[in-house]
């Protein structure tokens, strides 16, 4: 990833998600990294850009409507759930991964659920921007584009938001 560009593979090995994690922090630290060993630098930047296009607009929308606390809960839930899913999908292998895509999909899911209530507030340009991002996010769910493991990790982000949303509704008595 970007860290390995400057610090070599040792940093990547220490912080990435692992199919066989050696340290507890690897369930979380891989979310804060991007790319993979040997990936071309352009791929790292494209991956980071696409994640940013999900996280910034939809995360901001979520924070405005649900508050910072719920955004943090969604972030942590998506991070941990995607790490666990990665672990179970790859436990027979010895591989590593990095990325924040599950958090992005959790935020997009929340945004898609919130947008209809806010649609009138947006200009036509902003509406088209959100529709484009939702379409792009949908494309990245296709296994033919991202592969099955990535698709399932992206889906874990969707499930994460739904778990937090359903849990918060249950705690408030369904209000």
Label each PLM-derived region with a short phrase:
Residues 1-97, 143-149:
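N-terminal TM1-TM2 helical hairpin plus the immediately adjacent luminal interfacial "cap"
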Residues 4-5, 9, 61, 121-122, ...:
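Residue-level signal for well-ordered alpha-helical segments
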Residues 17, 120-123:
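Short secondary-structure boundary/capping segments
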Residues 23, 69, 84, 88, ...:
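C-terminal transmembrane module of polytopic alpha-helical membrane proteins
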Residues 49-70, 107-119, 159-171:
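Membrane-interfacial alpha-helical segments at the cytosolic side of multi-pass membrane proteins
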Residues 69-76, 98-103, 123-130:
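Cytoplasmic-side transmembrane-helix entry/capping segments in multi-pass membrane proteins
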Residues 79-80, 106-109, 132-138:
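Small-residue-rich segments of transmembrane alpha-helices in multi-pass membrane proteins
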Residues 93-116, 153:
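Membrane-interface micro-motifs in multi-pass membrane enzymes
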